[in-house]
């Protein structure tokens, strides 16, 4: 049901090379720059300390992934090989931009995010670069978004969907699937909105990067409510972070995995029972332990606990 990569024939992924032995139906991963911008150090921690065999690439050496030059790509490949890590996807900033002709989004940043600052007219280049990176790092997935959130996206929604469909077709011709992340600052923030988008954009090469943390931040109960609405055969990636509701406010802040409002054990159990076997990737965001590395270590402990409670980690 779910599209698999190089390890499709394996029912379980054994993760042994550097750390403890982990067995899971999922590709357990972490986004590298949630640990540190030092790519070698991030890979060492993921493999040796976390026992992972998979990693998600977003930025390194203080550069966004799509801005790496050939020398840096080669060096990243050498490091991945050293630590026997496979790449889940390219966490590209594709379509994280303003929609042309629409009112300026209040979410449109005034400075680069994760080292990315690309206009709408540059998105074709971002797509091409992302596909080339996917090929270079031997993955079949590229993360994308659906433009900075508008107060009223309805007049532009059909054109946005057409743009996504065209990009998915371009990617599909080269064996790549786009995984669109539900993101509070973009026009698809929740499971409910994701279900509508997937129904409107019918392409095997456009799937969902399901992010329960982002859905919670947008006011949805991601599991079971948001997840229940999703077409399970179009979930192509999953980000893992937690969110806690601020006291006396209808707002949320990031939390360590297991310390927020999301039923992650239930979510992992449902994914497993629904036949999902692709990535569950730690995207810490929370920095309550003082540093990115310390916070990610603490959040990884919470993620492991939830996976074990779900029967998705041995």
Q: Across the structure, where does each feature detected by a protein language model lie?
A:
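Histidine-acidic metal/acid-base catalytic patches
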Residues: 5, 9-12, 20-29, 36-51, ...
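Active-site acidic/histidine proton-transfer and metal-coordination neighborhood
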Residues: 5-14, 19-20, 44, 97-208, ...
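Active-site-proximal loop/turn and secondary-structure-junction residues that shape catalytic pockets
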Residues: 34-36, 59-61, 93-96, 146-150, ...
């Amino acid at each position: 049901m779910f599209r698999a990569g190089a390890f499709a024939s394996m029912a379980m992924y054994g993760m042994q090379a550097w750390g403890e032995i982990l067995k899971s139906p999922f590709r357990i991963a972490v986004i590298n720059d949630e640990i540190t911008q030092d790519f070698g150090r991030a890979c060492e921690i993921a493999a040796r300390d976390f026992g992972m065999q998979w990693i998600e690439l977003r930025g390194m050496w203080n550069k966004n992934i799509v801005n790496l030059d050939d020398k840096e790509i080669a060096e990243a490949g050498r490091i991945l090989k050293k630590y026997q890590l496979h790449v889940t996807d390219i966490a590209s900033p594709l379509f994280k931009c303003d929609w042309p002709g629409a009112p300026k989004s209040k979410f449109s940043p005034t400075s680069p995010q994760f080292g990315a600052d690309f206009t709408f007219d540059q998105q074709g280049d971002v797509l091409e670069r992302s596909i080339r990176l996917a090929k270079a790092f031997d993955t079949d997935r590229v993360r994308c978004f659906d433009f900075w959130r508008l107060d009223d996206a309805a007049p532009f929604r059909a054109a946005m969907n057409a743009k996504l469909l065209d990009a998915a077709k371009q990617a599909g011709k080269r064996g790549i699937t786009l995984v669109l992340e539900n993101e509070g600052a973009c026009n698809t923030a929740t499971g409910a909105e994701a279900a509508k988008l997937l129904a409107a954009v019918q392409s095997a090469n456009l799937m969902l990067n399901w992010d329960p943390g982002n859905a919670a931040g947008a006011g949805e109960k991601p599991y079971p409510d948001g997840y229940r609405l999703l077409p399970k055969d179009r979930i192509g990636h999953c980000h893992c972070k937690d969110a806690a509701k601020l006291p006396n406010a209808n707002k949320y802040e990031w939390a360590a995995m297991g310390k927020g409002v999301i039923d992650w054990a239930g979510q992992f159990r449902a994914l497993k029972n629904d036949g999902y076997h692709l990535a569950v990737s730690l995207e810490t965001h929370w920095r309550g332990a003082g540093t990115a590395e310390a916070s990610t270590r603490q959040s990884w402990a919470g993620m492991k606990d939830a996976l074990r409670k779900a029967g998705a980690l041995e």
